[in-house]
């Protein structure tokens, strides 16, 4: 750097000059590294990106743009049996409902078609591959994405992408860094292709414990650091609390999903969803909770009311009441969606007059 250039650098003292300097620097960073590479944490800035809904209104709202972004990589990770594959299949179901074509690369060889159908996936139209090794899985993924005809591609899971050299080697062979190098090379190629084709790529990942960590979080994800960097969205999915029981049988779990990283909107949002065994995420429970938060459904103590109609005592009875009335459910859903689009959850659209309905049981 020349002496003249060094002299030109000086810290602005005036508040307006400092603000202008920050805006200029942010503009230069976005020009060099892309929109969304820097933002103010408290800002509600969003990118105009195409998305695929997750099927959960609360999670779509937490993601800031209405779903997972197309043309980018999303990582879903967490402990075992936390709901990672369920969430990925729910996204596939939503993409198919919108007329999209989806692919599922089952590296774990554990996809349950019966469960997938229960989540709303059209298994007759779902492209499925069960590769023999990690290289084959990522090559298949690249070919699918390059076709430009795939809307969502899921890899389940990164931990199961075993390098060919490891499979062909002897048990106990030390092959450090093979999987990390494989992922790094593949992601460098895939990122640009995804951006051009608009395919949403979902990598499901597992967590491991780092040995000897005394302070901080001992958890880490498999496959090296590359996926952490290339992913535009990272979702931490894990069960919390005790299972919900009916009698002695556990029927559901509460799952907390946190947006650990989000390059298309503000990160660090959290949602809690009910995961019903054999059925997936309870979308109606999610809708009722969100509508109550937005004051579309009024809550007074344990009683819920919609418009002038009291619809139930307690959330479970309210959900059951709405489930029997599809027209009411759709009306509430439309108002919640309108409030989300308006960007103001505190002011919901006015309730349209509805015909009188029989009084809900309060007991």
Curated annotation (Swiss-Prot):
Pfam families: RecA (PF00154), RecA_C (PF21096). This is Protein RecA. GO terms for biological process: DNA recombination; double-strand break repair; SOS response. Keywords: ATP-binding, Cytoplasm, DNA damage, DNA recombination, DNA repair, DNA-binding, Nucleotide-binding, SOS response. CDD domains: RecA. ATP binds at residues 78-85. It is found in: Cytoplasm.
